[in-house]
């Protein structure tokens, strides 16, 4: 099924870009470090502009596309490479922001920090839209992937930096909430990008029944995880709504 048109030349370009950007090379970790530090300072300074600016150099979205493309096409080598890059980048981001937070000492949690400690269903919906925008921009050569890429990176790096900063403040629950936000965004982008790639004809050609069975088998774990985290964030949104109603009632 091909809902979005994609030339063979465009496919080769996209595949090469994703594969190259999913390699856990020195330049990859360098850019992760730089983007994490900028995002961390933006969170501490309570500056949305600085946080967004950090995304211009953030490389963590490409390995997610690499995982999506590898699952769609059933390519183990690309899958392993992209997973290694993503895990390494995530680990580096949390450790770097934790180290920065410890080095700075006692700092006040800002609104930018606090807003990322209790994710809910709206955060998931934003990530879904960002994931589609980024994947579609890759597929359609008339659209520059730069702007959607920034949008996606905004959903990836700040929660990781926030998690490390919260841990530095001794707020383990807030740090876990921030990491949960990253995980929700990661799964949303992964699933939506995979669907976009399938609709673009990027999956390997098999018989219809065989192709469906292969995709179902490869996507069982991501889809189940996505459904579970969607349910959890929906419950979180319900709790936040109830708390606000109670607060209004008390007033």
Question: Where are each of the predicted segments found?
Answer:
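Small-residue-rich segments of transmembrane alpha-helices in multi-pass membrane proteins
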Residues: 87-97, 152-164, 217-223
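Alpha-helical transmembrane signal-anchor/signal-peptide segments
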Residues: 240-251
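Alpha-helical transmembrane segments and their membrane-interface boundaries
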Residues: 1-131
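Cytosolic-side transmembrane helix boundary signature
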Residues: 190-219
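Hydrophobic alpha-helical transmembrane segments in multi-pass integral membrane proteins
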Residues: 97-101, 161-170, 227-236
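A cytosolic-side transmembrane-helix exit/cap motif
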Residues: 69-81, 166-174, 195-204
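Internal/C-terminal transmembrane anchor helices
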Residues: 212-240
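Hydrophobic alpha-helical segments
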Residues: 110-192
